[in-house]
Amino acid sequence: SGLSATLCGAPHGHPLLVELAEQAGVELTAQSEGDLGQRLEAAMSQALCTHDAVLVIGSDCPGLTVQHLHQAARELARHDAVFFPALDGGYTLIGLRRIPTGFFYDMPWSTRSVMPETLRRLVALGWQVWSGEPLADIDTADDLVHLPKHWPAPRVEQMT
C-alpha cells in the first residue's frame, strides 16, 4: 500500500510504548526534545525523508478512525495539507507533503487559535488545504464524555 506507521513517544523505551509498538507491528522512535511544534516538525521531517507525505495523529482522539486516516491520505494526494480539526480549536490529525523549516515556531499551542493560525500560515504559503469534520479530543476530565460508551474503562467511569 506504500503506507507505513511509526509510534513516536516519550519516554522512549517505556514498556507500554514498546508493547503497543510490538502489538501493532510498527517501529517505535523517540520524540525529539522541545515544545509540541519542535517535536512535530522533527517527526514530520524525519518521515518526509523516506515518504512523499506524512500524517500525524495524537493519542487523545478516540473518535479518529481508520476511515478518517484513509480519507486524509486520499485528500493529501490532492492537497498540500490536510486536517481533522479538534472541537477545541486545535487539530486531531495533520497531514503535510512538505514541512517548511520553523513552520510551527511560536504556535499558540493549547488555545482555540491553533487551527486558525495554522490555516493562516498555510494560506500565506499559497498551499491548498483540505479539512474534515471537527472531532473531539481528550484534554481535560470534562472531555471524558467523548469516550466511546463501549470502551471498558473502569477508572474513567469512576471519574465521570
Regions found by a protein language model. Give the residues of each.
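A short, N-terminal amphipathic alpha-helix
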Residues: 1-4
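Short, glycine/polar-rich helix-capping loops at beta-to-alpha or helix-loop-helix junctions
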Residues: 12-18
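Short phosphate-binding loop-to-helix
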Residues: 19-53, 111
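Conserved alpha/beta core of the MobA/IspD/sugar-nucleotide pyrophosphorylase nucleotidyltransferase superfamily
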Residues: 114-160
